[in-house]
């Protein structure tokens, strides 16, 4: 992988991580034009850049949650405090993806990366997002979120281990299905992703510095930095967008991309 290709993949990661269109699917597709799949390890490590963008953008909220949660363990904060509850909601919501990632890590690296699977789940989960966003109530706020909902949204996040599902798309779909407003759904989705993505990214980084697909350490670092810069801008833009608009443009894009992939695969224009 050249540095130019690393920059392009970093741009793709940064542009697509927070939109409900699946960054891993787009990295997989981009690999078609760059001589091969960049790999699950490369994807996991570059996601560290976009999750660092989440930490920077939500630094005040994350700081409050961490402070309140840690103080509650010592009896210094009531368990019903909103920030304490959010801390527990993030923890319990992270458990499903931790279990699934450990149990299915080999399948994630191989079978799940088939473009046939990517195309199908782009369409299916795009339709689910559209239905949840269109027909669900939108009046539930963060204070209404139950631990049961947190676990359910966490299970949705675990499904995003399959490229094409989209971490933000799956968690937002689940939250919208439970009736939470778009800003609440998006913020919880972002906060929920932090421990999961940092965990998987650091695990892959420590596990092997030479298992980053065709990318070397330098190229991976460049892609991660680009993903951070672009991702920070995308978060800000998305939070403004969803305050007044729906997810329907992303639904249309997902379905269209999935259909195009199926046609290209069916005609033999591209290989799975």
Swiss-Prot record:
It is an enzyme of class 3 (hydrolase). Pfam families: BacA. This is Undecaprenyl-diphosphatase. It catalyses: di-trans,octa-cis-undecaprenyl diphosphate + H2O = di-trans,octa-cis-undecaprenyl phosphate + phosphate + H(+). The chain crosses the membrane at residues 1-21, 38-58, 84-104, 112-132, 145-165, 183-203, 219-239, 250-270. The keyword Transmembrane applies. It is a multi-pass membrane protein. Bacitracin is thought to be involved in the inhibition of peptidoglycan synthesis by sequestering undecaprenyl diphosphate, thereby reducing the pool of lipid carrier available. The gene is uppP. Belongs to the UppP family. Catalyzes the dephosphorylation of undecaprenyl diphosphate (UPP). Confers resistance to bacitracin. NCBIfam families: PRK00281.2-1 (NF001392), undec_PP_bacA (TIGR00753). The keyword Hydrolase applies. GO terms for cellular component: plasma membrane. Its EC number is 3.6.1.27. InterPro entries: UppP. It is found in: Cell membrane. GO terms for molecular function: undecaprenyl-diphosphatase activity.
């Amino acid at each position: 992988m050249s540095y130019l290709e690393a920059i392009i993949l970093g741009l793709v990661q940064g542009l697509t991580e927070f939109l409900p269109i699946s960054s891993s699917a787009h990295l997989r597709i981009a690999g078609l034009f760059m001589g091969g799949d960049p790999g699950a390890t490369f994807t996991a490590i570059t996601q560290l850049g976009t999750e660092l963008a989440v930490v920077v953008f939500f630094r005040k909220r994350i700081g409050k949650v961490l402070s309140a949660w840690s103080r509650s363990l010592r009896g210094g904060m009531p368990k019903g405090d909103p920030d304490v509850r959010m801390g527990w909601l993030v923890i319990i919501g992270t458990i499903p993806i931790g279990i699934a990632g450990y149990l299915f890590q080999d399948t994630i690296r191989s079978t799940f990366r088939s473009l046939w699977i990517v195309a199908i789940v782009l369409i299916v989960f795009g339709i689910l997002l559209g239905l949840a966003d269109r027909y669900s109530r939108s009046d539930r706020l963060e204070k209404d979120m139950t631990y049961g909902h947190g676990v359910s949204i966490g299970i949705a996040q675990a499904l995003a281990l399959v490229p094409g599902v989209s971490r933000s798309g799956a968690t937002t779909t689940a939250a919208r299905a439970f009736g939470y407003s778009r800003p609440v759904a998006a913020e919880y989705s972002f906060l929920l992703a932090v421990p999961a993505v940092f965990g998987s990214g650091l695990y892959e980084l420590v596990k092997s510095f030479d298992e980053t697909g065709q990318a070397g350490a330098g190229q991976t670092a460049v892609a991660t930095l680009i993903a951070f810069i672009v991702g920070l801008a995308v978060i800000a833009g998305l939070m403004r967008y969803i305050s007044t608009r729906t997810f329907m443009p992303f639904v249309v894009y997902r379905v269209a991309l999935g259909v195009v992939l199926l046609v290209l695969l069916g005609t033999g224009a591209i290989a799975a």
